[in-house]
Amino acid sequence: MPDAEQLPDGWEKRTSRSTGMSYYLNMYTKESQWDQPTEPAKKAGGGSAGGGDAPDEVHCLHLLVKHKGSRRPSSWREANITRTKEEAQLLLEVYRNKIVQQEATFDELARSYSDCSSAKRGGDLGKFGRGQMQAAFEDAAFKLNVNQLSGIVDSDSGLHIILRKA
């Protein structure tokens, strides 16, 4: 049985914010597990051609449209958001199409229409790693290629479109 204080190389012990339980984070791949590791952490890709080349961090912009079912249905733009989820989706579809058709830039639309305070930076969230964003948002962001625009992503905060920059 491994010693509780001594972890193999590449692992870090953390505490879950939602459950208060300890978990273990692979510092190379940012994957986590509940069971205490007994072997050194594997590095991203593992050297095999099909092993994937998952980044440690991504740099993304996003445009958030909140709806009345959002976790906090208010924003810097509106004190009380009353639109439905369906209305939010229609708005995002219009914004996404404008970007794809090159009728507007992501930066312009985020500054004008995003319900996130990052709107002031054109939706720029900067770089972030695994475990820093809501799971649905994070999963979508890490699946994107550089300069790829996501479809509509549903999170507790509302609906998003995401543009990965790095």
Swiss-Prot record:
Q: Which InterPro entries match?
A: PPIase_dom_sf (IPR046357), PPIase_Pin1 (IPR051370), PPIase_PpiC (IPR000297), PPIase_PpiC_CS (IPR023058), WW_dom (IPR001202), WW_dom_sf (IPR036020)
Enzyme nomenclature, EC number = 5.2.1.8
Give one GO term, molecular function aspect: DNA-binding transcription factor binding
WW domain segment(s): 5-39
Q: Which Pfam families match?
A: Rotamase, WW
The EC class name is isomerase
Question: Which stretches does the entry tag as region Disordered?
Answer: 32-53
Compositionally skewed regions (Gly residues) per UniProt: 44-53
| Listed GO CC annotations | cytosol; nucleus
Q: Does the keyword Repeat apply?
A: no
Q: Which residues cross the membrane?
A: none
Q: What is this protein called?
A: Putative peptidyl-prolyl cis-trans isomerase dodo
What would be the name of the gene that encodes this protein?
Answer: dod
